């Protein structure tokens, strides 16, 4: 699957570089990832089905974990 990876607080990961997002996504067993520069959040492609991605729901800061 693909989408915006989230932390434990359901918050997307902000970014400025593709390298940061690629590392973050690969750590989550994705095939690749990049910084989607229209909104400055990491986007992953090829994630496992059980990997959490952004859906409906609010971000609850304090759950940030790489």
UniProtKB/Swiss-Prot annotation:
Record GO terms (molecular function): sodium channel inhibitor activity; toxin activity
Ranges where the LCN-type CS-alpha/beta domain occurs: 1-60
Disulphide connectivity of cysteines: 11-59, 15-35, 21-42, 25-44
Entry-linked SMART domains: Knot1 (SM00505)
GO biological processes: defense response
Xref: Gene3D superfamilies: Knottin, scorpion toxin-like
Tissue expression: Expressed by the venom gland.
InterPro entries found in the cross-reference section: LCN-type_CS_alpha_beta_dom, Scorpion_toxin-like, Scorpion_toxin-like_sf, Scorpion_toxinL, Scorpion_toxinL/defensin
Keywords, sorted A to Z: Disulfide bond, Ion channel impairing toxin, Neurotoxin, Secreted, Toxin, Voltage-gated sodium channel impairing toxin
GO cellular component: extracellular region
Record-linked Pfam families: Toxin_3
Subcellular location: Secreted
Summary of the function given for this chain in its UniProt record: Alpha toxins bind voltage-independently at site-3 of sodium channels (Nav) and inhibits the inactivation of the activated channels, thereby blocking neuronal transmission.
Annotated domain remarks: Has the structural arrangement of an alpha-helix connected to antiparallel beta-sheets by disulfide bonds (CS-alpha/beta).
Record family assignment: Belongs to the long (4 C-C) scorpion toxin superfamily. Sodium channel inhibitor family. Alpha subfamily.
The protein, known as: Putative alpha-neurotoxin RjAa16
């Amino acid at each position: 699957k693909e989408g915006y990876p989230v932390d434990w607080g359901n918050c997307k990961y902000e970014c400025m570089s593709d390298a940061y997002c690629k590392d973050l996504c690969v750590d989550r067993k994705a095939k690749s990832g990049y910084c989607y520069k229209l909104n400055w959040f990491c986007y992953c492609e090829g994630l496992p089905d059980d990997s959490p991605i952004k859906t409906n729901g609010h971000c609850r800061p304090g759950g940030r974990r790489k």
